[in-house]
From Swiss-Prot:
Keywords: Membrane, Repeat, Transmembrane, Transmembrane helix. SUPFAM superfamilies: Multidrug resistance efflux transporter EmrE (SSF103481). The lineage of its organism: Eukaryota, Viridiplantae, Streptophyta, Embryophyta, Tracheophyta. Residues 16-139, 188-313 form the EamA domain. InterPro entries: EamA_dom, WAT1-related. The keyword Transmembrane applies. PANTHER family: WAT1-RELATED PROTEIN. Belongs to the drug/metabolite transporter (DMT) superfamily. Plant drug/metabolite exporter (P-DME) (TC 2.A.7.4) family. It is found in: Membrane. GO terms for molecular function: transmembrane transporter activity. This is WAT1-related protein At1g43650.
Length: 343
């Protein structure tokens, strides 16, 4: 019972941390922080925070790094971290913090579709769990599109308020651009998830692998930022909210929540951790309503409902499939034992 409470509290804390990421990032970008420079500093904080723990805690799991493996890690970092995060922060500049939180609920759906395309996932439409996985993915992706592009009547409108921070209310044109960019960022992240599973089989030291990817991403982001913006003044970060946002995203989001999720997955399984994903969306919606005075439309609410329904439907299908597989394995082992006894 105590373990159950600890796992629940850990996952609630993780989602609170995740909810803070788009909110703080939005404020920092709105105050003039260059999004590409933001990614560089975020990854630098992450690499510095993870490296000592990776060195001391996983010394027994260290395995040799071949040139080919190092090259794989470099390109995975480029696609999944550097490209994904840079697109994410460009999107944050042109959309709302709520949309950024909402689209994370579509990640399982996008990952499932990509896994099917790469033949890493199988589905049986003759079984209820197979239908649930496909339907959940379709509903989740539909929810992301509805949230992004369907407005309808406004439910909460604060735009007439004089307390809105400058630059936090995107225009319609920028909202469309930001929505498409955010979906592209999530797609890159989903590709990272798929590629990560293969590399982890070759390099089992998880924390060292993440620390190495953060280091590569930091270097790549520096090159990207210099190539896009040659103005040296963009690298100067004043002590305040922008610096706090970078440290928060690097240390708290990439560092602390990683360990909490790994611990929860070991204790309760991956489905348990995924069930808490919509909590970040709810928290972000509440805070954004007061902080950024966001307008909430009926279409946004409908899209959020579809996202959450698609997430849970897909998770149910995946859980059911795993239960059937475990039952099949137990039956096979039982038959083998019976045959041995007979012989």
């Amino acid at each position: 019972m105590m373990m159950e409470h600890k796992a629940n509290m850990a996952m609630v804390f993780v989602q609170i941390v995740y909810a803070g990421m788009p909110l703080l990032s939005k404020v920092a970008i709105s105050q003039g922080t260059n999004p590409f420079v933001f990614v560089f500093y975020r990854q630098a904080f992450a690499a510095l925070a993870l490296s000592p723990f990776a060195f001391f805690l996983e010394s027994s799991k260290s395995s040799p790094l071949s040139f080919i493996l190092l090259l794989k890690i470099f390109f995975i970092s480029l696609c999944g971290l550097t490209l994904s995060l840079n697109l994410y922060y460009v999107a944050i500049e042109n959309t709302t913090a709520t949309f950024a939180a909402a689209t994370t609920n579509a990640i399982p759906s996008i990952t499932f579709v990509l896994a099917l395309l790469f033949r890493l996932e199988t589905v049986t439409l003759k079984k209820s769990h197979g239908v649930a996985k496909v339907t959940g993915s379709m509903v989740g992706m539909l929810g992301a599109l509805v949230f992004a592009f369907v407005k309808g009547p406004s439910l909460i409108n604060h735009y007439n308020s004089s307390t809105i921070p400058n630059g936090t209310v995107p225009s319609t044109k920028n909202s469309v651009k930001g929505s498409i960019t955010m979906l592209a960022a999530n797609t890159c992240w989903c590709l990272w998830i798929i590629m990560q599973s293969k590399v982890m089989k070759e390099y089992p030291a998880k924390l060292r692998l993440v620390a190495l990817q953060c280091l590569f991403s930091c270097i790549q982001s520096a090159v990207w930022a210099v190539a896009v913006n040659r103005n040296p003044s963009v690298w100067k970060i004043e002590f305040g909210l922008p610096l706090l946002s970078m440290a928060y995203c690097g240390i708290m989001v990439t560092g602390l929540t990683y360990w909490l999720q790994v611990w929860a997955i070991e204790k309760k399984g991956p489905v348990f951790t995924a069930l808490y994903t919509p909590l970040a969306l709810i928290l972000t919606c509440i805070v954004s309503s007061f902080l950024f005075k966001e307008t909430f439309y009926l279409g946004s609410v409908g899209g959020a409902v579809l996202l959450v329904c698609g997430l849970y439907l897909g998770l149910w299908g995946k859980t059911k499939e795993e239960e059937i597989q475990r039952y099949g394995e137990k039956q096979s082992q039982k038959e083998i034992i019976e045959e041995v006894i007979i012989v």
